[in-house]
Amino acid sequence: VNYDENALANLKLSGSDAKKENIKEVYMDLTNVGGPNKVLMDLNLLKDNSLSQSIGINDNVVAGEKEIPVTIVDKNGENHKALGNLTVKSKVGVGPLDFGFDESRIYFTVTDRFFNGDKNNDDPHGNNYDKKNPYTYHGGDLKGLTDKIPYLKELGINTIWITPIVENTDFNQMFSQGKTQYSYHGYWAKDFEKLDPHLGTMYDLKTLIDTAHDSGIKIMVDVVLNHAGYGMKNKEANSGANNYPTEEDRAKFKGMFRENPGNDFITQESAGLPDFKTEDPEVREKLIEWQTGWIERSKTEKGNTIDYFRVDTVKHVDNTTWKVFKNKLTEINPSFKTIGEYFGADINNDGGQLQNGQMDALLDFGYKGKAREFVNGNIEGASAYLDDRASKISNTNLMGQFLSSHDEDGFLKTVGDDLGKQMLAASLQITDKGIPVIYYGEELGMSGWNGFEQGDQN
């Protein structure tokens, strides 16, 4: 493997004692590939005496044969040693898509709000949306993204992150309250194997991928494994709304949801959305099958497909699921990368997600605050933090810096609509170590407040 790929470490245990109950822990020493000296392997994945986990290669590692020491600690505390081998190759790239994941320049767009390329798919279920309302569908689609590839190429973007593409529920989620709210954002899934009709057709998706790749731009798709949409677990107060999910719609998720939600991050129903029992191996495998299936499903006649996933609600799903998910992605394509939304993460708080077979990168929630400090005059303090941040970032310990997002107040609003401060912060963002993530419209000085009643989603 080269430094922009993941390898799958496979450990085969032998002997009658090679059972989970007889093992205290198993860990790898990844020092020889630029990783930590103790990376635990997840014993929940022990199956048929085998254990697998994805590993990354630091780009400072010299090409050649590398040894991976493995230690198995039995229930009595005794250590048993093993040794794995890995060949690290030099990365040779000649094409416009041969940049490393850590060289990405991401443009994040809420697809429905970007550009309407096909008005025929604006209202597939006859809901008669009021497009002046910020909580309904406005018509942006995949064809609209394709039409604007030249603009994004000129801007210098090499990766487009688009909101989830799976079919979402399409009913007024606030019908019973006399208000309006639809899942234009894509995070309330109805069917994980179908493309949402508001976005267009599979032909449109494949055309976007081919057109982007022809322009040296990769496609990152947002995926959710934590929850489905409202109305997909049981009938709710809004069941009188047009196009409310049917029993047939709900049947595909039978037995997959948590019946007795808890109060912790893993077991709670975030925002009241039906929570998947991802710690159940059957539920986990089904969700991973649905999401990774899009890599083959979206493959074009040219052989192009989705390049990366942005992973939603990482904090709300068990770590074993993320290891299985990453293992599957590595099997499909060693170069397929993920950037996770672990809410509140920064360079000093990755929630245990990086360098252990789970996420390849995390969105950096702490960055915008330090950028704001810098542009407001605390140059020395902010610079010290950013220098320390840069010293800790590598291609295997990677953060994506953003100033604004669909979940938080726009940066420009938080600095009093001062465009000079916005531009200075953007200069920091694009040149700092890590992956710059530009929120759509931000390059034009567009911004808004977060919050349901403020109406600045566009």
Language model region names:
Residues 1-7:
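Short, solvent-exposed loop/linker segments at the N-terminal edge
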Residues 16-30:
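Solvent-exposed loop/turn segments flanking beta-strands in beta-repeat/beta-sandwich domains
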Residues 72-74:
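Conserved structural position at the C-terminal beta-strand
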Residues 80-86:
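Edge beta-strands of extracellular beta-sandwich domains
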Residues 26, 213, 217, 289-292, ...:
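Active-site-proximal helices and loops of the catalytic beta/alpha 8
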Residues 100, 104, 114-303, 322-333, ...:
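Substrate-binding/active-site clefts of carbohydrate-active enzymes
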